[in-house]
Amino acid sequence: IKVGFAPTGAFTYPKSNDEKDVEAAKNMMFKNITQDNWVWNVAWWNDPVYLGQYPKEGLEALAAYLPEITSEDMELIHQPLDFIGMNIYNGQMVSADDQTSWKLEERYIGFPQTGMKWPITPEVLYWAPKFLCERYKKPIYITENGLASPDMIAADGKIHDENRIAFLDQYLHYYRKASDEDIPVAGYFVWSLMDNFEWAFGYTERFGIVYVDYTSQERTIKESGKWYKKVIGSNGEIIK
């Protein structure tokens, strides 16, 4: 049995492969505490568990609000885990900036997005595992990755969710790139097997590769499900 945990968080990827952009993206992912989003959670929740200490940037910024953190607390929190788990759907593009160390790049009008209006940024499935594994020295499982879409059964009885196939193909391309470079990506779980009750959106969003009729409970494999079977059967060889 192997044990890990999967806290939520937000992730970054560099605008280019230039060393300064890469370092800026990494720093924003782990050190940023000013952006009004979830980026800070990555270090705040993972550092104590994997490194045995809270990041100094957070301790300094939140000093007036924090309770006393004792060595006994850290001994309990810092337990030996076998892997990192992360739900990764999208990321924020970052570039280097001489004044602020990093700059969040604005997305252009018409930037690709899912049915939930989440940005589609497949590069993050390479860069986020790379940054996480470099920092925490553990293999990583992608515990969630997928696309929400207003799927429906067509006249031919099929669910033609080619947008989901394209999404998964693009993301898995970068996941394979990470694997090819010996980044220890240990596993990938598509979200989700079936359409389900999404914790913040109820039954309004469909993530499944299997369609669920919520009235009759009948299940129908979507075209993405048939495609994903081929991905598994080929061990990813059909990924473009």
Predicted regions and their residues:
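Active-site region of glycoside hydrolase catalytic domains
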Residues: 1-240
